[in-house]
């Protein structure tokens, strides 16, 4: 029987999951419509992949968490935890792959540096970005092969209880190794964000020396992109904290509250960033406003029909 606090956490997690599926589903739907019209751009492809991978990631988070809460004995026998681990790695890595590609895209499109290499990359963004995405994908696949080896080696050492018989130090070391790809993507995103902030600061300093003091459209683009990237960093830090809490829960399996708090913190990232992307992207924002207007019109029609 769940306590009141645990029930609240379950409600919050389910609400976050619903919002996450709706937000990411909306992003994917808008870009799929553009794809059907042969209007899908590079940013549209990245956003579509990011939305799909995050929906997948949300379902993995919920499935894994609910199994640990309501049926923890399932993980003590059989190969379910192995399959969940593989699915988790695929969803996590693919989500971070697209998120890092999005960060690089904003950096190349908006940042402004006088460095020759950067200018060369910036002038060839549409050509360079696919190569960078391919490089990130290859590194992700290589890391996945390493993860498979870790999981197989660990399974051979633990025939009866797959996860819980491990020493704490060994367990945490293996978790770090399993998340090396995510750490790499996060570091790369952080670097692009910092460089973009530096570019924005320099541009604002130049604008302040101007007599008018007005911000041009380029500065507005810098600010919008910086908000998106900074929000991504903040949400992803929360995502890391949530994962750490869920991982720590295996050392104290009787503490369900710690797991629920970890799930709540982890689920903030895939749904929160999707709504920030909708508000930060003019096409997605306009599409969302049209949907809201249509919903309001439908509500008014229902009210008028009920009065007749």
Curated annotation (Swiss-Prot):
Membrane-traversing stretches: 7-27, 43-63, 101-121, 127-147, 180-200, 228-248, 258-278
Keywords: G-protein coupled receptor, Glycoprotein, Membrane, Receptor, Sensory transduction, Taste, Transducer, Transmembrane, Transmembrane helix
All ranges on the Cytoplasmic side of the membrane: 28-42, 122-126, 201-227, 279-308
Residues that carry a glycan: 92, 158
Its membrane topology: Multi-pass membrane protein
InterPro entries, per database record: TAS2R
GO terms of molecular function: bitter taste receptor activity; G protein-coupled receptor activity
Record carries keyword Transmembrane helix: yes
Extracellular face residues: 1-6, 64-100, 148-179, 249-257
A Pfam short name: TAS2R
Subcellular location: Membrane
Main location per the UniProt record: membrane
UniProt entry tagged with the keyword Transmembrane: yes
Gene3D superfamilies: Rhodopsin 7-helix transmembrane proteins
Top-rank taxon: Eukaryota
Function: Receptor that may play a role in the perception of bitterness and is gustducin-linked. May play a role in sensing the chemical composition of the gastrointestinal content. The activity of this receptor may stimulate alpha gustducin, mediate PLC-beta-2 activation and lead to the gating of TRPM5.
PANTHER family: TASTE RECEPTOR TYPE 2, TASTE RECEPTOR TYPE 2 MEMBER 10
Note: Most taste cells may be activated by a limited number of bitter compounds; individual taste cells can discriminate among bitter stimuli.
Protein family: Belongs to the G-protein coupled receptor T2R family.
Protein name: Taste receptor type 2 member 10
Organism, as annotated: Pongo pygmaeus (Bornean orangutan)
Highest classification ranks of the organism: Eukaryota, Metazoa, Chordata, Craniata, Vertebrata
Gene name of this polypeptide: TAS2R10
